Structures are given as C-alpha cells and as structure tokens.
Curated annotation (Swiss-Prot):
It comes from the Bacteria. The keyword Cell inner membrane applies. It holds the Pfam family TrkH. Low-affinity potassium transport system. Probably interacts with Trk system potassium uptake protein TrkA. This is Trk system potassium uptake protein TrkH. The chain crosses the membrane at residues 9-29, 35-55, 70-90, 136-156, 185-205, 240-260, 276-296, 325-345, 395-415, 455-475.
Length: 482
C-alpha cells in the first residue's frame, strides 16, 4: 500500500475542495449576511491541511493497487465530510455543536438530506447556499464513483450491471479512460442542473431558491432552503418539475450518456432497471392515490398530486416533501418508507439497495420456488435474454446479507442510546438508504437525537453511499496484510 501516494491524492482533493468555499463567500458578500469570515477561515484551514499532505509527497509516483482504491474511496468521503463541517461550526449562525455540524455535512455530501437544523428559513443565505452546494458536489462525486471508479474495484451496482446485464452498455465502457468518463458525466450532470434551475425559475421560484433546489434535486439530496421544503411554494408546476428531474436523476447516468451520444431515448425503455423503476413507481402512485382518496380528506386531484410527488420523492430517496407522509392513514407511511430500500438505478445519484439488486433477488427467489416444483430442472436467472452467472447471484446475496447484518447492528446501537424502536428503525433505514426523512421522533428533524446515535447514523450514511463493501473491506485483516 502506497501511503505517500494516498496522502498526495487526499491532499490534492482537499485543496480542490477548499475552492468550493469561494461561492458561499461571494453569496455572503452579495447578501451582506456577515458569514464570509467563517468561510475564509474554513478555506484557509482546508487548503493548508491539503498542502501539508500534498507538498511533501508531490513527487510520489507509484501504481495504485485495488486495495489503495478502496481506502481512497472511503477516505475521500470521510475527510471531505469532516472538513465540510468547518463552516457550519465556525459561523455560529445555526448554533451547531461539532457533532451536529459533522452530521449535517455528511448528510449533505452523501445526499442523505437528514437535518439537525430547525428554523432553516431564518438562516443566512451563505449557509443556505452551502448546504445545497454540499449535496450537489456529493451527487457529482457519487456519479463518478458509481460509474467510473467502483466498477474498477469490482464492487457496486454498476460492476454487476456493466459486466453481465444486457442493454446498451453491454461489453463497453462509456469512454476508454476514467478521466474522460468523469468529464462526460460531469457535463451531463451540469446540464441537468442548469436545465432544472431554469425550469424552477420559469415556474415561479426566485433565482436563489431555483439554484439551491436544482442542486439538491439533481443530486437526489432533499435539502431545501425552507423548513416546509417544496411544500413552501404550494405550486403544482414546481412539484411536477421536481418529480420529473428526480426521476431522470434516478436513472443511470450511463443511460443519459448513451441517450446524449446517440440522440435517442429508446434506451430508457430497453433497460431492465429503468423499466422496473418506472413500473414500480407507477404501481406505488396508484396504491397511494387510491388509499388517500378512500381514507383521507384530500380531493381526488389533490390526493393524486400529493401521491405522485411523495412517491417519487421518497422512492428515489430524495426526501423532499409537500405533506407530512408520516401522518397519512393506514400502512402508507410504512409502504413509502420501505420503497426507499429499493432506491434508484445503479450509476444514479439515488440511494437504497439499487434496483438491479432487487431485480436479481426477486428472480433468484422465483428460481428457488421453481426448483421446489422441478427439483431436477436447470433454471437460469435471466435479465432480458442473458443468463446471470452464479457468481453474480452470490455477490448480490452477499451484499444483502451484509446490509441486513449492518442494519441490525446499527439499529441495536441507536436503540441502546435511548431512542425508541420506531425512531431507531426509521432513522437507520433513512440514513443507510440515504433517504433523509424518518418516522417517529425524527419525522421533523434529527436534532433531538443523542450525540452517539448521530455518530452511528453518520456511519450509516457513509456505508450506504459507498455501497457497504467499500467500507467493510477496510476492517478485514486480509486487507492490511502485505
């Protein structure tokens, strides 16, 4: 393992990350909210630390191995999450403790969207902008990580997807080099962001809200510049725009690349993941709208409007809200919350276990049922017309087993801090799936949870964002052997 190379890369990343504190400084000066000094100090600390890591090792040249990639991926999010909390601690405007500042920073960068802050409408504009920017940067990093980096390490949904699943991406990479792939993905990501912001402005948002919400929409993050989230605007047009861009961002960015390159949209309907996600959301919308129509005071159109928005927002793991879904009748809150466990497509900014894994788990389950009926039959698991090798099936079940085990351990850990069962279950689920909104005592915000519970949930956010194995492998003795 090349420690000097890792320090060189992390130092460079920190210095680059420090530049992201320049826009909040400009926003602070524009709105004269007095927050610019804190961002200047945070910038200085970040760039100084990065320089101390980079400069002594700037001439280090050594080929990185797979295990170095795992460590860099985990440290990338951990280090940026810690340094990203500096402005939130230094401003004092949100009155955040170090624990709360770290929680908010990790929630932003992992695009979870869980918040410990109350009175968001009263925050200075620089802080509001910074929270939204954290999610946008996190979303951009996730796309590159999921599509360009994790597959080279052999983990992540796209590693399964690109090697074994039929469709427009079969047997091909987006571009020959990771650098070129990253540039292509960033171009698409930025284009979607600008388009989303312009659409929000056309629907009635001011430029500041439109920019901030476009950041968290394309990133499927869920942070808002208002306590009431998207519901603050009370606009069907804004809700429709938000739902549309959440759905687009929940599709694999590899599909967007192919659609952009070939100038046609048929790939979305040929792709097994995209088709499953569209059918899954349509089914949930029908169930939710009918349930609201039968059991609540919503008028038919209002119930449909809220059903469409909340289903898309929760199921894609964004967590925006126009209504408090936790108060909806019957099993609807539980149903919507569980939908987030499915999440977005592999290679998207969405969280959850990823659609491709759910498809494979369902198909393997059906295969075992058929084997009970026909014990001697050789039954292949197929996606489209292509058989999925048993190694892929084992990888999916391995991920699912690790997911369930870690969920249970963190659930017990959060409950041990004194949190009730419903709140503990939902907060672990919301953070591990990078959803944000929870049920129980954390349905409004996470601020009242014990500090130890918040640190456990920070770990859950990181595990969910890095698709578990990227972090878990670091704690195996074999990883550290020479």
């Amino acid at each position: 393992m090349s420690l000097r190379m890792i320090l060189r890369i992390l130092g460079l990343l920190l210095m680059m990350f420090s530049l992201t504190m320049v826009p909040p400084i400009l926003i602070s000066l524009l709105f004269a909210d007095g927050m610019w000094q804190a961002f200047v100090v945070a910038l200085g600390i970040t760039v100084g630390t990065g320089a101390l890591m980079y400069l002594p090792n700037r001439h280090a040249r050594k080929e990185l191995r797979t295990r170095d990639g795992f460590l860099i991926a985990a440290l990338f999010w951990s280090v940026l999450g810690l340094f990203g909390s500096l402005p939130l601690m230094l401003t004092g405007a949100a009155a955040l403790s170090p624990t709360d500042a770290v929680f908010e920073s990790f929630s932003g960068l992992t695009t979870t969207g869980a918040t410990v802050i109350t009175g968001i409408d009263l925050l200075p504009e620089a802080i509001l902008y910074y929270r939204q920017q954290l999610q946008w940067l996190g979303g951009m990093g996730i796309v590159v990580l999921a599509v360009a980096i994790l597959p080279t390490l052999g983990v992540g949904g796209m590693a399964l997807y690109r090697t074994e699943i039929p469709g427009p991406l079969k047997d091909s990479k987006l571009t020959p080099r990771i650098t070129e792939t990253a540039k292509a993905l960033w171009y698409i990501y930025a284009t979607l962001t600008v388009t989303c912001a312009l659409a929000y402005m056309a629907a009635g948002m001011n430029w500041f809200d439109a920019l901030g919400h476009s950041f968290s929409t394309v990133a499927i993050g869920g942070f808002s510049t208002h306590d009431a989230s998207i519901g603050y605007f009370d606009s069907a047009a804004i809700e429709l725009i938000c739902s549309a861009f959440l759905l687009i961002s929940a599709f694999s960015f590899s599909l967007h690349f192919v659609a952009w390159r070939e100038r046609r949209l048929t790939h979305y309907f040929q792709d097994p993941e995209a088709r499953f996600l569209m059918l899954f959301l349509a089914g949930l919308i029908i169930i939710t709208s009918v349930s609201l129509w039968l059991t609540s005071d919503y008028e038919t159109l209002q119930g449909l409007r809220h059903a469409v928005f909340e289903v898309v927002s929760i199921a894609t793991t964004a967590g925006f809200s126009v209504a408090d879904f936790s108060t909806w009748p019957g099993a609807l809150p539980f149903l919507l919350f569980v939908a987030a466990f499915v999440g977005g497509c592999s290679g998207s900014t969405g969280g959850g276990m990823k659609v491709i894994r759910i498809i494979l788990i369902l198909k393997q389950g059906m295969r075992e049922v058929m084997r009970l009926i026909h014990p001697s039959a050789v039954i292949a698991v197929k996606i489209g017309k292509v058989s999925v090798p048993d190694g892929i099936a084992q990888a999916v079940w391995g991920f699912f087993s690790a997911y369930v085990l870690l969920f249970f351990l963190m659930l017990v850990g959060v409950m041990a801090t004194g949190v009730d069962q419903v709140t503990a279950w939902s907060t672990v689920g919301a953070t591990l799936n990078n959803l944000g909104p929870a049920l129980g005592e954390a349905s409004a915000h996470y601020g009242d949870l014990p500090s130890l519970a918040k640190w456990i949930l920070v770990v859950a956010m990181l595990l969910g964002r890095l698709e578990i194995f990227t972090v878990v492998v670091l704690f195996t003795p074999a990883f550290w052997r020479k």
